[in-house]
Amino acid sequence: MKRTYQPNRRKRAKTHGFRKRMSSVGGRRIIAARRRRGRKRLAV
C-alpha cells in the first residue's frame, strides 16, 4: 500500500506557503497568530 505522505517541496509551498496564507482572510489570521506567538517560521 502507498503511504499517504509523499514529500514534494513545490506542492508543500503552494498549499501551505506564505503567499497562499496571505491570499485568504483565514490565512492572514494564521500568520498574525503565529507572529503574536513569536514563531520563528510563519509559514513552511
From Swiss-Prot:
HAMAP family: Ribosomal_bL34. Residues 1-22 have a biased composition (Basic residues). Pfam families: Ribosomal_L34. GO terms for cellular component: ribonucleoprotein complex; ribosome. Residues 1-24 are annotated as: Disordered. It comes from the Bacteria. Keywords: Ribonucleoprotein, Ribosomal protein. Belongs to the bacterial ribosomal protein bL34 family. It comes from Rubrobacter xylanophilus (strain DSM 9941 / JCM 11954 / NBRC 16129 / PRD-1). GO terms for biological process: translation. This is Large ribosomal subunit protein bL34. GO terms for molecular function: structural constituent of ribosome.
